[in-house]
Amino acid sequence: MKATQTLIATTKELPKEAVLISHQYMLKAGLIKKLASGIYTWMPLGLKVLQKIQNIVRDEMNKAGASELLLPSILPSELLQETHRWDKFGPELLKLHDRHNRDFCYGPTHEEPIVDMARDTIKSYKQLPLNLYQIQTKFRDEIRPRFGVMRAREFIMKDAYSFHENSQCLRNTYNTMYATYCNILDKIGLAYRPVKADTGAIGGDNSHEFQVLANAGEDIICYSNGSDYAANIELATYAKSDLSKRVNSQNTIEKIHTPNIKTIEKLCKEMSFDIKKTIKTMVIKDAGGNFFALVIRGDHELNETKINKLDQIIAPYTLATKEEIFSIFNANPGSLGIYNCPISIIADYSAIAITDLVCGANEDDYHFTNVNWDRDVTNYQIADIRNVVTGDISPDGKGTLELTNGIEVGHIFELEDVYSKPMNANIIGQDGKSKPMLMGCYGFGVSRVMAAAIEQSHDENGIIWPESIAPYQVAILPINYNKSDKIKEVADKLYQDLLGDGIDVLLDDRGARPGVMFADADLIGYSHHVVIGDRLLEQGLIEYKNRKTQEKQEITIAELIKILK
């Protein structure tokens, strides 16, 4: 492609809301242009990157035995009413009416239409398993769309849905899709981790997220430095302490005056306590109106997902109000503890491992020291209710856990019959009986992975794409292209030769100043830069620059061809 035949719309102007590097660089490089809040035009260079990602996704999905289709983006309300999502989805569901006043929505996901199609066309187990996918524009009316295409209202997603007769068949396809997502991200060239994830309201036994590692990631993921264990922070767990090795203390409880101390941090600072010897007692109320005292070590944080999954808790829970707490303890938050606690205690394993702990005295301005489990507090339950921290022992006992930030670009689920059952998507099984098909769903954020790639790899000058998805593999940057016949001749011939070799190449024939050409090339992120100028050309040389390494070489065109091949 010649630069004069496409639209290179680089700019120095940035809106104030462009906080993330990916958002800034996509706007500055002219990859996208904002049309409305959370809605973007894909400019030629941006679309080229997007299409390269789509091609990789499509190629790997086809290799995995999936078949592509395309579902409508506008969905009738009747389908979502069958699964009760018409009302449950909330304001993120963009609803509209046609001229006959019939209700429709812009599809946020496509479970209902794919099940509707399947129930009309799949009648027997003999037609299964079947894995269908699409690459489709979706819309979710985010209240505060932000971060550019990372969290836009309109976005492009690959969503696949598989259909099965039994759980083993579903698990086989799930494992295939897990491997396929790894292949996609490997082929793109991103550093990532598949992590065990919460199934949430969907349920089922299996769910994995695919997280691209980046400092700007909103998700926190943990992984073992000694094994392949990895999980989202919501689900991550740790090796439990051996409570049989806990030392029996001979120290007696002591009540100490702690005026105006309401936080663990202030308590440790003013009283010189080790925070790892303290506990926090927080009161919650579950959906059944039951109160519980949740106990974790002073330097740990509660994990909402784990708590809602406890058998004792009727989810969802809420934190008790200050008034509710005072009516139970006759004390305020910040002074609560486990000694003579009037409600049921659920303590984290790490809190249970502490000997001679420090806690609130259930009396304002007082704390207890030297409190011990099983001696002073005997009525309690133990559960994993906290977030893991760096240094925790991996649950498989191999290595310790480390935390990092990630950007979720893929998520796979075993849906089972969550959608097929309410929509009566039944088949005749091998036993001759009618039963709901089991399903898996597999989402991949095509537009989101583009932003994630920028977050993972960039410098102060612009984007450093993985070569597989760079808008152009090579940029020819001729100095004085429109003024020097010799420069033009060499540049044009090199351009044609590279095209003939199947190399994705851009010839910058705009006649722009060298500084502008070089800055644009760095900003846009072409993988290989070839500068053709009079001085080197007299020696039969050109200047080659690798965008990723920044290495420059003065080489012949023959040597350049070897590098590019």
UniProtKB/Swiss-Prot annotation:
<dbReference type="InterPro" id="IPR045864">
    <property type="entry name" value="aa-tRNA-synth_II/BPL/LPL"/>
</dbReference>
<dbReference type="InterPro" id="IPR004154">
    <property type="entry name" value="Anticodon-bd"/>
</dbReference>
<keyword id="KW-0436">Ligase</keyword>
<dbReference type="Pfam" id="PF00587">
    <property type="entry name" value="tRNA-synt_2b"/>
</dbReference>
<dbReference type="InterPro" id="IPR044140">
    <property type="entry name" value="ProRS_anticodon_short"/>
</dbReference>
<protein>
    <recommendedName>
        <fullName>Proline--tRNA ligase</fullName>
        <ecNumber>6.1.1.15</ecNumber>
    </recommendedName>
</protein>
<dbReference type="InterPro" id="IPR050062">
    <property type="entry name" value="Pro-tRNA_synthetase"/>
</dbReference>
<dbReference type="InterPro" id="IPR033730">
    <property type="entry name" value="ProRS_core_prok"/>
</dbReference>
<dbReference type="GO" id="GO:0006433">
    <property type="term" value="P:prolyl-tRNA aminoacylation"/>
</dbReference>
<dbReference type="GO" id="GO:0005829">
    <property type="term" value="C:cytosol"/>
</dbReference>
<dbReference type="GO" id="GO:0004827">
    <property type="term" value="F:proline-tRNA ligase activity"/>
</dbReference>
<dbReference type="InterPro" id="IPR023717">
    <property type="entry name" value="Pro-tRNA-Synthase_IIa_type1"/>
</dbReference>
<comment type="subunit">
    <text>Homodimer.</text>
</comment>
<dbReference type="Pfam" id="PF03129">
    <property type="entry name" value="HGTP_anticodon"/>
</dbReference>
<dbReference type="GO" id="GO:0005524">
    <property type="term" value="F:ATP binding"/>
</dbReference>
<dbReference type="Pfam" id="PF04073">
    <property type="entry name" value="tRNA_edit"/>
</dbReference>
<keyword id="KW-0067">ATP-binding</keyword>
<comment type="function">
    <text>Catalyzes the attachment of proline to tRNA(Pro) in a two-step reaction: proline is first activated by ATP to form Pro-AMP and then transferred to the acceptor end of tRNA(Pro). As ProRS can inadvertently accommodate and process non-cognate amino acids such as alanine and cysteine, to avoid such errors it has two additional distinct editing activities against alanine. One activity is designated as 'pretransfer' editing and involves the tRNA(Pro)-independent hydrolysis of activated Ala-AMP.</text>
</comment>
<comment type="similarity">
    <text>Belongs to the class-II aminoacyl-tRNA synthetase family. ProS type 1 subfamily.</text>
</comment>
<dbReference type="InterPro" id="IPR006195">
    <property type="entry name" value="aa-tRNA-synth_II"/>
</dbReference>
<dbReference type="InterPro" id="IPR007214">
    <property type="entry name" value="YbaK/aa-tRNA-synth-assoc-dom"/>
</dbReference>
<keyword id="KW-0547">Nucleotide-binding</keyword>
<dbReference type="InterPro" id="IPR004500">
    <property type="entry name" value="Pro-tRNA-synth_IIa_bac-type"/>
</dbReference>
<dbReference type="InterPro" id="IPR036754">
    <property type="entry name" value="YbaK/aa-tRNA-synt-asso_dom_sf"/>
</dbReference>
<dbReference type="InterPro" id="IPR002314">
    <property type="entry name" value="aa-tRNA-synt_IIb"/>
</dbReference>
<keyword id="KW-0963">Cytoplasm</keyword>
<dbReference type="InterPro" id="IPR036621">
    <property type="entry name" value="Anticodon-bd_dom_sf"/>
</dbReference>
<keyword id="KW-0030">Aminoacyl-tRNA synthetase</keyword>
<dbReference type="InterPro" id="IPR002316">
    <property type="entry name" value="Pro-tRNA-ligase_IIa"/>
</dbReference>
<dbReference type="GO" id="GO:0002161">
    <property type="term" value="F:aminoacyl-tRNA deacylase activity"/>
</dbReference>
<keyword id="KW-0648">Protein biosynthesis</keyword>
